[in-house]
UniProtKB/Swiss-Prot annotation:
Protein name per the record: Polyribonucleotide nucleotidyltransferase
Gene Ontology MF terms in the entry: 3'-5'-RNA exonuclease activity; magnesium ion binding; polyribonucleotide nucleotidyltransferase activity; RNA binding
EC number: 2.7.7.8
Positions contributing to Mg(2+) binding: 498, 504
Underlying gene: pnp
Amino acid sequence: MPPIIHERSIEIAGRLLTIETGRVAEQADGAVLVRYGETVVLTTVVGAKQPVEGIDFFPLTVEYEEKMYAAGKIPGGFFRREGKPSEAAILAARLTDRPIRPLFPKGYRNEVQVISTVLSADQENEPDVLSIIGASAALTLSDIPWYGPVGAVRIGELDGELVINPTSHQLLESRMDIVVAGTADAILMVEGQANEISEDRFIEAVVRAHQEIKRIVAVQLELQAVAGKPKREFVPPQENVELKQQIADYLGDRLREAVFNPDKTLRVQATAALREEVIAHFVPNEPLAIGTPQSGLPTAKEVGDLFDSLVKELVRRTILEQGERPDGRKPDEIREIWIQVGLLPRPHGSALFTRGQTQVLTVCTLGTKEEEQFLDSLGIEETKRYMHHYNFPPFSTGEIRRLRGPSRRDIGHGALAERALLAVLPSEDEFPYTMRLVSEVLSSNGSTSMASVCGSSLALMDAGVPIRKPVAGVAMGLVTDQTTGRYTILTDIQGIEDALGDMDFKVAGTRDGITAIQMDIKVMGITPEIMRDALEQARRGRLFILDKMSEVIDAPRPEMSPYAPRILRIKIKPEQIGEVIGPGGRVIRAIQEQTGTKISIEEDGTVFISAANEDAARRAVREIERLTRVPEVGEIFYGRVVTIIPSGAFVEILPGKDGFLHISEIAPERVRSVEDVLKVGQEINVMVIGVRPDGKINLSRKALLEKEAAERAATAQAPADGRSHQPRAPQRPSGTAQPERRPGPPTPRRPEQRGPSRPPRPQAQRSTPPPGQYRIGDRLKELLGEDEPN
């Protein structure tokens, strides 16, 4: 029988958002198709019926799949099928995960898997936001316990106006690109980048986005009313209050002494030792430590969980009531900062940023246009000239684990730090380099991603990259009392505050505004008022960090590292690209080989020349300019005859550029046959006598011969002072061969016999050629000699 299909629609930003269920994936616990424009995302959710034993976390996995057929593309590679998730897909999966995770019941240990599959992508409406809406709708319609639904929108700013769900092309001009997700009552997640927007403007954008989120939530509730399943019964595990009090009485003040220690290593060691002592005391029989309670005795896991709960309550209560943090700081106090730049001799730029026990080494490498990252995704094909990679090795936390590729966390942290610097990078016209930043976390105690932002800014300035302003980042925390409504905002949170607090709010920016932001929470949402207080406290912290950074380096270095490549950029006409490349790439390869450079040419005629030193790059520039410049009337060239036809000859005057020498312009006297005077391969002096609109060049040899004859006649007469003048030999460019012989072909030169006993021939002193005169030889090296023509 045909499926029963239910759908609800709402207009968002002038386009119809449709959520549909019942058509596909009927065996999933929840499945929806979300359409917006011509972008379609299928999101499914499946939950296990039984909890996973022996774990202390919620086993939620979120996958985001980009199918290349969605954009009408065939995947690359040998197998022509999708492989591992792209970086964009991983970021979209994390974006989907964060707003739905806080709404699962506390203590829920059943495995849940959410999969969003992009089925159609119109390259205008971004599918990542639809994935959040789809995950929420699928969970809402399923029987899995969940306290949703949530809605999500993207917000931008064009011409001073806030725009909901801007298209991909509008985002290119937008001052902000921020995704906001939340329930009907509160904000759950914020992530994005901006071009130095103020804190007030950011709050305004979030409030505007929340208005649309409420409408999206209402649509899901309407759909749930007609197509939702009854929720499974779930009873959260209850704490053993009596046992918990016994453990607290046993510990006394020793728990505070262990937890409140400014040194993370000592705190972890003391807390772990105390935890083992408590377990040994309350679970004396070792076999019972891993089994089910017998005779009223608890298990080791139960005692350990109660100990962890006491630690959490102690930290949160002390922060709320006394304003004291585990390391002794006040809520708005930043840890001690120590900075060093230029500590690595060979990399192009480096910075070591240390904040408390968090330490990050960031290294900057400058590359060429060809080293840009190609983004093969469902969207607009593009390349990326600025990259930031984040590495989190196990020794940074004193742990041991296998070294593998970057984790999802590594990719997410790297992307956040990357977005933070985009607003201050120089344009490609100003700085035509590819920039790769790598942040190595050497020691971790919270806020490593924001330390990477600071390190990136410092390393770029150390490398001489002309960023407009330095950027700093700080991570904010939150501790709330759900009963009284009291809350305390923490500046520069450390690891224990991140783990036991309610929020991780990362804010990066310059002195003038926010450039990147990311907010994750563990409660049911926060209000704009809390967010406003957190942003103001973050602004003060950011300015403090920027002051510390400016004490070490306050502006980009005037010179780049001597080990960095030198890149020059010139512009040629698109129709001249073929002249520079040459047949089969012969010309451009010759230039690169002779000058030691790398040359890349864009479709619009932009040419990038990179070399180990600037002199080599400028030699290549001069050669390209010779290839592409249009000769002017009156210029004299020393060219080679390449083709002879009855009406004249074609003479190569520049590499790949020929001019036509008509038979009447070969000599002053009448020439019956071109071959009587010229031979293919003969090198002659010619003058440009005309350039046609289509670029064709007319040459004359006769004009030069007549001029030489007139000069010889003038110099044959004795001057008034009685001295005689010797005839002056015609000057030729450096490296030219024997002078032209007229009228017949040049006499071939016999090769010299060389041997061990024959001394090397002395090098002749090269003469300086007259202005506008060039010789085209077999080797570009002769053209690019030490004595360049003026």
